[in-house]
Curated annotation (Swiss-Prot):
Enzyme kind, highest EC tier: transferase
Name of protein: Queuine tRNA-ribosyltransferase
Residues holding Zn(2+): C308, C310, C313, H339
Active-site residues per Swiss-Prot or TrEMBL entry: D96, D270
Length: 380
């Protein structure tokens, strides 16, 4: 895929780490990296409009193949003119393969060489997803960046199981490449798996790099391992990937994990974290996490985060946000979601500047001293 519609341009390497400043060029525009991608599971980033996403600096969003396949259906979206037109988003879109959702949401899974049979979590009907079908759905969706269909072994599964799993994922990746109908306007990434085993990650990366994908995803992390274990896997995995292609760490959204991923050479991240926790009143601030629903904020007439200049922090107080959330008002969720997304997008903007200034390690130290550091590795 050397004539891929997805191009990575390296602008600068940070002197003291593996971090890199760059940009990714797609058919729907160019975005700077490192970048956090908000997740629009059902073709919408929950409670946020496309205009708000652009306002907060989101250069690309992610949508979920599994959910859109089940509802409203990829063929309907194709008839609407593709996902960009359907959801009125004219900037880049990345879609996952549906694999992770099949393994985490669906019941009664049965994995064979052909693909995965499972029960639809909405109505219980029996369904089948193969590498070819995953590509076909994404071709219908028309995303700029698509993912290969992979198996997602858990981090602590036995070596022999993980070895068989990555070998199958490599065969599935090859099948997906052959099934890809739109290589001229949709890039396709391979997904490196291998749990915590360095030799299996090496084997997986070697297989996929030989297939010349548009970019490479690092899967199977942020699934229960410690922060230290995730960093160790990233330390050796990013070294196995080509410098002229994008690197995407899947499902990671905790601020300290984003910075640590960038330090190890990752360009792209996604996670439902900012909008999911916002719905419960949990907000990311420069001083750490804050649960604005708590009683202590009932008469706190200060901004959510005095150091933040987002729409929420410029206009509303903690007391008002608490009132909205306690009253189950949707506007409260809109405001906390906006803030959390802005916080992560602004963090990545600061990280990009720190790479430019060659002081990313100092920035990390300063950030973690105020925000805190999550050793467990849980996305929070």
């Amino acid at each position: 895929m050397s004539d891929s519609p997805i191009k990575y341009r390296l602008i600068k390497k940070e002197k003291h780490t593996g971090a890199r400043l760059g940009e990714i060029i797609t058919p729907h525009g160019t975005f700077p990296t490192p970048m956090f991608m908000p997740v629009g599971t059902q073709a919408t980033v929950k409670t946020q409009s496309p205009e708000e996403l652009k306002e907060m600096g989101s250069g690309i969003i992610l949508s979920n193949t599994y959910h859109l396949w089940l509802r409203p259906g990829d063929e309907l979206i194709a008839r609407a003119g593709g996902l960009h037109k359907f959801m009125n988003w004219d900037q880049p879109i990345l879609t996952d393969s549906g694999g992770f959702q099949v393994y985490s949401l669906a019941d009664s899974r049965n994995i064979t060489e052909e693909g995965v049979t499972f029960k639809n979590h909405l109505n219980g009907s029996k369904m089948f997803l193969s590498p070819e079908k995953a590509i076909s759905i994404q071709n219908n969706l028309g995303s700029d960046i698509m993912m290969s269909f992979d198996e997602c072994p858990q981090f602590y599964q036995p070596y022999d199981y993980v070895k068989k799993s990555i070998e199958r994922t490599s065969r599935w990746a090859e099948r997906g490449l052959k099934a890809h109908r739109r290589p001229h306007d949709q890039g396709l990434f391979g997904i490196v798996q291998g749990a915590g085993f360095e030799d299996l990650r090496r084997q997986s990366a070697h297989d996929l790099v030989s297939m010349d994908f548009s970019g490479y995803s690092i899967g199977g992390l942020a699934v229960g391992e410690t922060h230290e274990e995730m960093n160790a896997v990233l330390d050796f995995t990013t070294q196995l990937l080509p410098e002229n292609k994008p690197r995407y760490l899947m499902g990671v959204g905790a601020p300290d994990s984003l910075i640590d991923g960038v330090i190890r050479g990752v360009d792209m991240f996604d996670c439902v974290l900012p909008t999911r926790i916002a719905r419960n009143g949990t907000c990311m601030t420069s001083q750490g996490r804050l649960v604005v629903k708590n009683a202590q904020f009932a008469e706190d007439f200060t901004p959510l985060d005095p150091e933040c200049d987002c729409y929420t922090c410029n206009n509303y107080t903690r007391a008002y946000l608490r009132h909205l959330l306690k009253a189950d008002e949707t506007f409260g969720i809109r405001l906390t979601s906006y803030h959390n997304l802005y916080f992560l997008l602004n963090l990545m903007k600061q990280v990009r500047q720190a790479i430019m200034d060659d002081n990313l390690l100092e920035f990390r130290k300063y950030f973690v001293e105020k925000y805190g550091y999550n050793k467990s590795g849980r996305n929070f």
